[in-house]
A protein has these predicted regions:
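Conserved class I S-adenosyl-L-methionine
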Residues: 1-45, 47-56, 59, 63, 150-177
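Class I SAM-dependent methyltransferase SAM/SAH-binding core
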Residues: 57-107
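A short acidic, Gly/Pro-enriched loop at the edge of an enzyme's catalytic core
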Residues: 109-118
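A short glycine-rich, Lys/Arg-flanked "PGG" loop and its adjoining helix->strand segment in the class I
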Residues: 134-146
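Short alpha-helix
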Residues: 190-209
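A C-terminal cap/extension of S-adenosyl-L-methionine-dependent methyltransferases
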Residues: 213-267
Length: 267
């Protein structure tokens, strides 16, 4: 295993408990997650068979399994998969939820079967360069049933909230624009992170996919690391989240923010 993959494994295993805690305590993270789920609900078939890549500690996998969907959740980090395994047992979800420790660029190792939907939330695929993404996307079509769909949540290059850091003298304000990505410190592990515009992601998918839909998350609302912002500034947060809603009615703004959601159908 190369050093980059090892860092991803170690870093996200170490931070798995923190992610679990955030889901229980951060209203901002829950607001963001609800945005993704609302989008996804519109695209899912009843009782759909879903492949989740970069599932983390299984927060979304458990949620959708409880709603009657069939999920196979994968992640490279053993600490994350340990959480999913524990939840399958404690929540009696064996019928609807299975999990596997697997990197997103090893999807060819999955047992041969077809899925109605492939899902990846909150920037898991941002650990891939554009070249690596192209390889991953090349595996999607063979995993999907006819009329299957993908929904990917990625971090773009343009994030107004981060750009505003420049007024505080923060040198990371424009880190997303770096061509070769940046190294994020995940619990002491240096994880190479790349930012992908919605336009470039669509271009990589055009060979096998059509009917693209893009929606932003946190166009003007605070980025996900401002976990207590809604409690500290409730009126401002409600105003900014309203602008987020409005911005998604204007096609030009849909690929910008802390994240964007991209859904497409297989050709």
């Amino acid at each position: 295993m190369n050093k980059s993959k090892q860092n991803i494994e170690n870093g996200f295993s170490k931070i798995s408990s923190h992610y679990e805690q955030l889901d229980k305590t951060s209203s901002l993270i829950n607001w963001m997650r609800k945005r993704v789920r609302k989008h996804l609900y519109k695209e899912l078939k009843p009782a759909a068979k879903i492949l989740e890549i970069n599932c983390g500690s299984g927060i979304d996998a458990v949620y959708f399994a409880k709603k009657g969907y069939n999920i196979h959740a994968t992640d490279i980090a053993p600490g994350m998969i340990d959480f999913v395994t524990s939840k399958i047992k404690s929540e009696s979800l064996k019928k609807n939820l299975s999990c596997q420790r697997l990197s997103f660029n090893e999807l060819n190792k999955l047992n041969p079967q077809k899925y109605n939907h492939i899902f990846s939330n909150f920037g898991g695929l941002n650990c891939s360069s554009e070249e690596e993404l192209q390889e991953v996307f090349g595996l999607f079509k063979q995993l999907l049933s006819p009329n299957g769909k993908i929904t990917l949540v990625l971090m773009p290059k343009i994030c107004i909230w981060e750009f505003l850091k420049i007024f505080k003298g923060n040198k990371t304000a424009f880190r997303r624009l770096k061509k070769d990505g940046v190294f994020a410190n995940i619990e002491g592990e240096q994880v190479h992170t790349f930012y992908h515009s919605a336009k470039s992601t669509k271009k990589l998918l055009l060979k096998d996919f059509k009917n693209f839909k893009v929606e932003n998350i946190c166009f003007l609302a605070p980025t996900g690391n401002h976990v207590d912002f809604p409690e500290k500034y409730p009126v401002l947060f409600n105003t900014l989240s309203l602008f987020d809603k409005i911005s998604n009615k204007i096609s030009f703004f849909r690929g910008y923010g802390d994240y964007y959601i991209l859904t497409a159908s297989v050709k």
